[in-house]
C-alpha cells in the first residue's frame, strides 16, 4: 500500500492512467497488479491500519484483498491472449475480488492469476518471472513492435549456450588472474 501512496503522491499514478487512456499498454506484476485495480484492502493490517483500504488506479476491474496467508508457489499458467503456457512464481498476500474481468492468465488448477482489460492493453498478474520465458517475451515485444509500425520478429532472438559461456568465462579468469596467489590468500595453497 505504501507503493500505491507513493506513486499517487508523485503524480505517477495520474500519468499511468493517462497513458492507458491513450492506448499505451500497461502491465503490472504483483504489487503493480494490485495498484492497477479498483482498490487494495488490508483487513488485517498487514501493510497499514487494520481495515484500511486505498483506491487503486482503476484500470483493472478487480479489488485485491490482502489476506493473512501468503501465497508462495511456483506456477504454470495459460496466458489467454497469446495462448502460451507461462511459468513463474507467486509470492503475495493478495486475493482477487470483483467482476467483469477478463481472466488473462489462469493456472492449471483454474485459479486466475492475471486479469486484463481494455482489449488486453492493460493487464496485471501475480506471476513473477513471466517475462523470463523467451517465447512469451517475444510475443509481447512483437505486439509492441506492431503498435510502432514495425514488423514482428516472430521468434526469440536470445541464444543461451551456457556451456560455451562458462568455458569463455573460465578461460578469461585463467588468463587474467593469478589463481595461485588467490589460493594462497584464502589459505588453500
Positions of predicted regions on the chain:
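Cysteine-nucleophile active-site neighborhood
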Residues: 1-87
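Amide-donor transfer/coupling interface in amidating biosynthetic enzymes
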Residues: 17, 21, 62-189
